[in-house]
Amino acid sequence: MISMNPIMIRNNLSRSSSPAAPPTTNHSSTVDYFSIKPKLSLDINSQSDSNSTQSNNNEDTHSEQSDYNSYTHNQYYDSDDDEDDFDIRDQLLDPFDKITLSNCNEEYYSPLTPFDGQTTSPQDSIISSKSSNKSTTVVPSPQFQLTLPKLTTYSFLIVDDNIINLKILNRILLKLFPKCHIVQIQDSKLVKDLLHKQSFDSIFIDIEMPDVNGIDIAQFVRQDTKFDNMGMVAVTTRNSTQDLELFKQCGIDFTFHKPLNYSLDFMANSIDDIIITRKNKI
């Protein structure tokens, strides 16, 4: 009989009580990470695609619902706005339905469409201008005239006891002859001495002045042949036939009546004619 020590008996019992381990198979040679990686990638991509599709479907559904709500909302409020616009337009246009045209030849026409009120109506003129492609030639009004200043270097003497009249005539002469030289005298007693010291192309005199009036100055000028080439113009309120005849006898060449409501062309041409006529007499 074989004797066993306690240590051997304990080892045998532990071996007999533990289950048998299954046989192990080494797969390291056939299955690894690189062989299963493509499959894992396909599974992950397919899962993300399905999630994205579901999310897009949800967004499309929500967008369609929002568009429908927005459309119904806008349609409702647009109809209200249209009704308000029609009400405002009716309020503005209703008063004009009761207006009747009067004096259409003077009032009812386009300012850009010229027409002759004696030969055609403004309505016909407007219609014809719309249907016609030809340019309309606008005839300028005979009352409109362009006045060009004269650049002659005249020398003028103005004599008037009223300072306002002096300034008015001075301004007019400068408009007519921008290069002219003008001397103004308010004291008529100084005229004789000035005429002996300085020569002028023309002298403008007021008739009614204290001490030495315009008639006195005219007689003094025409008595001296030295001043035969100088024009003399009366600027006065006296315009009766007797006064004009008296002025002519005293040697006054022309008379402008106060106030000076003359066209600039008329005054410039009259002064030019007076000076030229006087100079040609020498």
From Swiss-Prot:
<dbReference type="GO" id="GO:0000156">
    <property type="term" value="F:phosphorelay response regulator activity"/>
</dbReference>
<dbReference type="InterPro" id="IPR001789">
    <property type="entry name" value="Sig_transdc_resp-reg_receiver"/>
</dbReference>
<feature type="region of interest" description="Disordered">
    <location>
        <begin position="112"/>
        <end position="139"/>
    </location>
</feature>
<dbReference type="InterPro" id="IPR011006">
    <property type="entry name" value="CheY-like_superfamily"/>
</dbReference>
<feature type="compositionally biased region" description="Polar residues">
    <location>
        <begin position="66"/>
        <end position="77"/>
    </location>
</feature>
<feature type="compositionally biased region" description="Low complexity">
    <location>
        <begin position="45"/>
        <end position="58"/>
    </location>
</feature>
<feature type="compositionally biased region" description="Low complexity">
    <location>
        <begin position="125"/>
        <end position="139"/>
    </location>
</feature>
<keyword id="KW-0597">Phosphoprotein</keyword>
<dbReference type="GO" id="GO:0000160">
    <property type="term" value="P:phosphorelay signal transduction system"/>
</dbReference>
<dbReference type="GO" id="GO:0005739">
    <property type="term" value="C:mitochondrion"/>
</dbReference>
<dbReference type="GO" id="GO:0006970">
    <property type="term" value="P:response to osmotic stress"/>
</dbReference>
<dbReference type="GO" id="GO:0005737">
    <property type="term" value="C:cytoplasm"/>
</dbReference>
<dbReference type="GO" id="GO:0005782">
    <property type="term" value="C:peroxisomal matrix"/>
</dbReference>
<comment type="function">
    <text>Required for stress adaptation, morphogenesis and virulence.</text>
</comment>
<dbReference type="GO" id="GO:1900442">
    <property type="term" value="P:positive regulation of filamentous growth of a population of unicellular organisms in response to neutral pH"/>
</dbReference>
<dbReference type="GO" id="GO:0005634">
    <property type="term" value="C:nucleus"/>
</dbReference>
<feature type="domain" description="Response regulatory">
    <location>
        <begin position="155"/>
        <end position="273"/>
    </location>
</feature>
<dbReference type="GO" id="GO:0006915">
    <property type="term" value="P:apoptotic process"/>
</dbReference>
<feature type="compositionally biased region" description="Low complexity">
    <location>
        <begin position="12"/>
        <end position="30"/>
    </location>
</feature>
<dbReference type="GO" id="GO:1900445">
    <property type="term" value="P:positive regulation of filamentous growth of a population of unicellular organisms in response to biotic stimulus"/>
</dbReference>
<protein>
    <recommendedName>
        <fullName>Stress response regulator protein 1</fullName>
    </recommendedName>
</protein>
<dbReference type="GO" id="GO:0036180">
    <property type="term" value="P:filamentous growth of a population of unicellular organisms in response to biotic stimulus"/>
</dbReference>
<dbReference type="GO" id="GO:1900436">
    <property type="term" value="P:positive regulation of filamentous growth of a population of unicellular organisms in response to starvation"/>
</dbReference>
<dbReference type="Pfam" id="PF00072">
    <property type="entry name" value="Response_reg"/>
</dbReference>
<feature type="region of interest" description="Disordered">
    <location>
        <begin position="43"/>
        <end position="84"/>
    </location>
</feature>
<dbReference type="GO" id="GO:0036170">
    <property type="term" value="P:filamentous growth of a population of unicellular organisms in response to starvation"/>
</dbReference>
<dbReference type="GO" id="GO:0036178">
    <property type="term" value="P:filamentous growth of a population of unicellular organisms in response to neutral pH"/>
</dbReference>
<feature type="modified residue" description="4-aspartylphosphate">
    <location>
        <position position="206"/>
    </location>
</feature>
<dbReference type="GO" id="GO:0006979">
    <property type="term" value="P:response to oxidative stress"/>
</dbReference>
<dbReference type="InterPro" id="IPR050595">
    <property type="entry name" value="Bact_response_regulator"/>
</dbReference>
<feature type="region of interest" description="Disordered">
    <location>
        <begin position="12"/>
        <end position="31"/>
    </location>
</feature>
